[in-house]
Amino acid sequence: MSATYTDLREKLQSLNRDSPKEVRKRKQPASDTEEEDEAGSEPEAEEEEARKVRSGIRQMRLFSPDECAAIESKIDEVVSRADKGLYQEHTVDRAPLRNKYFFGEGYTYGAQLQRRGPGQERLYPKGEVDEIPGWVHELVIRRLVERRIIPEGFVNSAVINDYQPGGCIVSHVDPIHIFERPIVSVSFFSDSALCFGCKFQFKPIRVSEPVFFLPVRRGSVTVLSGYAADEITHCIRPQDIKERRAVVILRKTRTEAPRLEMKSLSSSYQPERLQGSNRQHILKPKRSHRKADPDAAHRPRILEMDKEENRRSVLLPKQRRRSHFSSENYWRRSHDHVDTYTETGEDEGSPVRKVKMRRH
């Protein structure tokens, strides 16, 4: 009889254990000397990779519990307005255990793309998503400007990701051709973690150990730039979302970022339906606009993973790939902890199928 799991996170833990078949398939070193060389070089490479990731991260605790509660009530209002259908179509993107709310600027990604792969993401035409709510400016952005984390006028894109327990977002790099750096995120409702360099595998679903594990506390601000933003993927694993968690992601779009044109809006409508003010859309219809069912956490296909089923392996551009010791070649565990980051500055195996990641 097959094992029964009460939660997807238990299934992931079970699947991450090596099966005898997988162990037999692993390549054995040709000699004891080769084995010693590999054992000696891999930890050094892991430490170097983790050091590079750390160099691109700043993290600080900025919002008090009372301030968090005030912002969280505003996030609940956003959810309520979306449930009532008060936002534009492309403002809201729903998936099991994860809803996204785009403000200021929205863009195509994942299963919405006609052509998939890095560099294919496009901004929506101006006005296709709702403006950034006033409370985001007043309660969040203003504080970041006052603390000189970002310059005034930097943010023109705000995304709220609302996760339920067991939710996740697969490994990705925020599209470099769409967004300037840094990438700023503020966490609410509960503690979680951000993982760098993980591999996601599907059928069965499993997630590798990260190159670097970064605890993320409620009320904390995380700033990614340099290596951490551009040269390695980041993700949120299902096992790291134990309670509801929301994150406000604040970014600036590039002036030269490609944008969909209204006249080319697509193909899912028949010509006879394009009368009057009806507009075509170049996007595929969204998979679902319904809320996740209560038992969604126990299903094997979760969140954005269902959008990744047919994706090719998406790593970084060729010129940025490393032939050895890259985050996409090894499964690693970080021994670092968030307490090494302060407010004051910069100190602040083998899967069955290819890794499925995407720029996001």
UniProtKB/Swiss-Prot annotation:
Biased composition (Acidic residues): 32-48
Cellular compartment(s): Nucleus speckle
Family matches, as InterPro entries: AlkB-like (IPR027450), AlkB-like_sf (IPR037151), ALKBH5 (IPR032860)
Enzyme nomenclature, EC number: 1.14.11.53
Catalytic activity as recorded in UniProt: an N(6)-methyladenosine in mRNA + 2-oxoglutarate + O2 = an adenosine in mRNA + formaldehyde + succinate + CO2
Active-site residues, Swiss-Prot/TrEMBL: 107
Binding residues annotated for 2-oxoglutarate, in chain numbering: 161, 163, 172, 234, 245
Domain note: The C-terminal disordered region undergoes liquid-liquid phase separation (LLPS) for the formation of paraspeckle membraneless compartment.
Assembly: Monomer.
Function: Dioxygenase that specifically demethylates N(6)-methyladenosine (m6A) RNA, the most prevalent internal modification of messenger RNA (mRNA) in higher eukaryotes. Demethylates RNA by oxidative demethylation, which requires molecular oxygen, alpha-ketoglutarate and iron. Demethylation of m6A mRNA affects mRNA processing, translation and export.
Protein name: RNA demethylase ALKBH5
Originating organism: Xenopus laevis
